[in-house]
Amino acid sequence: LHLLSRRQRQMCIRDRGKNAFVQVFESTRGMRVGDEAEFEGHMLEVTLGPGMLSRNYDGLQNDLDKMEGVFLRRGEYTFPLDNDKLWDFKPLAKVGDKVAGGDWLGEVDENFQPHKIMVPFTFKGEYTIKSLKEAGQYTIGEVIAVLTDETGKDVEVTMIQRWPVKRAITCYKEKPRPYKLLETGVRTIDTVNPIVEGGTGFIPGPFGTGKTVLQHAISKQAEADIVIIAACGERANEVVEIFTEFPELVDPHTGRKLMERTIIIANTSNMPVAAREASVYTAMTIAEYYRSMGLKVLLMADSTSRWAQALREMSNRLEELPGPDAFPMDLSAIVANFYARAGYVHLNNGETGSVTFIGTVSPAGGNLKEPVTENTKKVARCFYALEQERADRKRYPAVNPIDSYSKYLEYPEFQEYIAGHISPTWIDKVNEIKTRMLRGKEISEQINILGDDGVPVEYHVIFWKSELIDFVILQQDAFDAIDAVTPLARQEFMLNKVVKICHAEFKFNTFLEVMEYFKKMINIF
């Protein structure tokens, strides 16, 4: 609904008798008793169609590039797409075909990506194509097909459709367990704790440990067709950095501008709390839309903590019973439902698509026991724990190799995929280096207590083998042109070399010899 006086967008989230509880997506300053409101008859919706790539939106899908001034003015909205642009349409179906919601009618070329024009997701049941436009140039508002439903009623279809952000798009045949490795070029992810196409992961860590840099590295380098960045409640300077940096970046896979396959949805921390909550749902809905085209979509949300804070704010204002740290009692269900929208799907026509979701969590004071981290840990299959101690020692990315994990390593489907595409011994080697890292940490603590001379030389060898793994495989320079992205073949080569060195027997007389030898070895890499 919206106020008639200022056209402010808002949504009814609860009603009791004659009273409606309304979530306002903008500042409520100046609102007064007696203001008239008008219901529009639908939930908060996004407009889906060709022309979304390369755009910068806010949480309500306003095109920020069309807005003037430094700040967003209340009640000012812009249409998210270009009404006048002509698109080269090619039909993929024919007159007489039976179709359902989500089926492909045709395609247009959007930034060198085939953008499928689909039967609107809101259509229920089976339809017959009565007429379909021939190949040619059309605007998004022109009728490109007329469908007949089971009752004989004709329905017109254009290139655009609308969908409520709080509902998942489920126009697919099945949603199996994901198993294909998503290559990111980041060694501590691909080698040690891999994520898959259609997988979920989260990156918790205190401020200053490199969450945003790691997210940017993944979004630049991941083998995804579409990248969506949801800056939810970020500081304004970080959002500006995204806006200025991404248009300049080159996609390492295609050599074209990275922005051509990217959508940015920005909600800074000084924007209204309710809009912050809407931004992650808007991003996920757009991601599901592109998944329905058979594309691999990567969605990065920074940070889901601020989204949860928005949920807490609204829960408090609704006077609901508070849970731990005043978060809503149903926080775990809200987080689980949102993460469940990601996934790998088989479409009705046999094609596959995926939404891979990686969110960051900013726990207050780096406390990983707080409710948002705990509830996210239950549903996300990958956990990349950023550690202040590693960041202070400049060991970036500061992902703790012992606390972090990937549940996908336990999936038989993933193990079979890795054995066929990389090596049958890959997972065994990964588990071995994790064990060596844990043993190295235990010995490091003993050396700190007893001193270098207080432990046997063999212990120093075990410790320095774990340091070799740390320096060679785990640490990576995100700002170096070569080291920033490591292809999978090179990761396999490095892992095999390091494991071979770890298996070798060494004879040293003093701990100083051990240190000198392994330092030289690390420098060679």
Residue spans for each PLM region:
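Short, solvent-exposed secondary-structure boundary/capping segments
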Residues: K18-V24, T47, D63-V70, K116-M118, ...
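P-loop NTPase catalytic core
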Residues: T191-V192, G198-M521
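Conserved hydrophobic positions within beta-strands
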Residues: Q10, N56, W104, T128-I129
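Short aromatic-glycine motifs in intrinsically disordered, low-complexity regions
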Residues: G41-G49, I117, L182-E183
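P-loop NTPase nucleotide-binding/switch module
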Residues: M67-D103, E107-E110, K116-T122, T139-G199, ...
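A structural micro-motif recognizing beta-strand termini
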Residues: R16, V22-T28, G41-H42, D58-L60, ...
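Single conserved hydrophobic/aromatic residue that forms the stacking wall/gate
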Residues: H2-R9, I13
